[in-house]
Amino acid sequence: MADIRNYTMNFGPQHPAAHGVLRLVMELDGEVIRRADPHIGLLHRATEKLAENKTYIQSVPYMDRLDYVSMMVNEHAYVMAIEKLLQIDVPIRAQYIRVMFDEITRILNHLLWLGAHALDVGAMTVFLYTFREREDLMDCYEAVSGARLHAAYYRPGGVYRDLPDSMPQYRSSAIHDEKTTTARNENRQGSLLDFIEDFTHRFPGYVDDYETLLTDNRIWKQRLVDIGVVSPDRAKALGFSGPMLRGSGVAWDLRKKQPYEVYDQVDFDIPVGVNGDCYDRYLVRIEEMRQSNYIIKQCIDWMRKNPGPVITSNFKVAPPPRLSMKQNMEEMIHHFKLFTEGMHVPRGEVYAAVEHPKGEFGIYIISDGANMPYRLKIRAPGFAHLAAMDEMARGHMIADLVAIIGTQDIVFGEIDR
């Protein structure tokens, strides 16, 4: 009798379900996966090395391009690390703005994850719905920073500027007549806070729509239940964090366990799974969107009652106001020095981590007292999750691999760095 031999197959890096440039070398027994070996590095851009040759402020835009779905949260970890080295305090209003935009970014990330995950598994409608909601949140990014994607809005010592008092308006065109344009501008007549508040009232209904389509859907459950099961102990041993860890039943969230900014001032719950499978991780992320919406509402209420500065008044760290800079020679010098030479950060080393939509995103900086980092290390949550791909996929069918890749919420910008 002839020996039964496994055969090897490549999955990606051009596969539509590979979520970027993932290449998996799979060993198959028929259609059953015996081994899945991830090959990474196809999106490596040497971000850590580039940061060693840029001033601290010049590296902020690089952070947006790591996980390019969760832009402002990447910036948050980076500026927090710099602030720890400088030992400066961030104005309380800036902290609330950061928390609010962290949660807007979390919803942005989870909406893209849900749409892409559902599309991979075969449910196309959800993808169209989630991108409708993402459009409103992208407009919030654009209102504060001028960019829909790579915002560079967080700065050491605070944020670039306060929230605007008006929203950009749609204009009528050959495609959209005046009546349609008026309807689209209906919720854009007030400030950015008014626009976000209107979104928070509408959003729970949208999440209900997603759940109506998916949560009790027989085919959705057949594709996700008991797929990619990871026990709590294995999840901790593998270095999981974020929804991947909470989906396995471990209630670990940096916003609660190691609170930063004003997370200890807002109320929210940590959703956790029971079985540690793809379906539990789906439920955890769905509930996280509801909790993020609740946090945003609390931030809006606080900011309406408490105006104030949004960046430190230390001109060695943050530029002086534009008007005074053009009227005062000393402030002009501060501005010139900051944007040419950059600020000199005290000697030392520091690690700052935030609860990223994908897990614990950390920045480790070693400073030698110069105006550039001596060494910058990025702790990407997706790296540990992708390393567990072999263990999660073993014994499953090829079709189940697509669900496992989706549940890991892989973005190669942060994994390859």
UniProtKB/Swiss-Prot annotation:
Signal peptide: none annotated. One of its GO terms (molecular function) is NAD binding. InterPro entries: NADH_Q_OxRdtase_suD, NADH_UbQ_OxRdtase_49kDa_CS, NDH1_su_D/H, NiFe-Hase_large. It catalyses: a quinone + NADH + 5 H(+)(in) = a quinol + NAD(+) + 4 H(+)(out). It comes from the Bacteria. It is a peripheral membrane protein. Keywords: Cell inner membrane, Cell membrane, Membrane, NAD, Quinone, Translocase, Transport, Ubiquinone. It is found in: Cell inner membrane. Transmembrane segments: none annotated. One of its GO terms (cellular component) is plasma membrane. It is an enzyme of class 7 (translocase). Its EC number is 7.1.1.-. NDH-1 is composed of 14 different subunits. Subunits NuoB, C, D, E, F, and G constitute the peripheral sector of the complex. HAMAP family: NDH1_NuoD. NDH-1 shuttles electrons from NADH, via FMN and iron-sulfur (Fe-S) centers, to quinones in the respiratory chain. The immediate electron acceptor for the enzyme in this species is believed to be ubiquinone. Couples the redox reaction to proton translocation (for every two electrons transferred, four hydrogen ions are translocated across the cytoplasmic membrane), and thus conserves the redox energy in a proton gradient. Belongs to the complex I 49 kDa subunit family. This is NADH-quinone oxidoreductase subunit D. It comes from Nitrosomonas eutropha (strain DSM 101675 / C91 / Nm57).
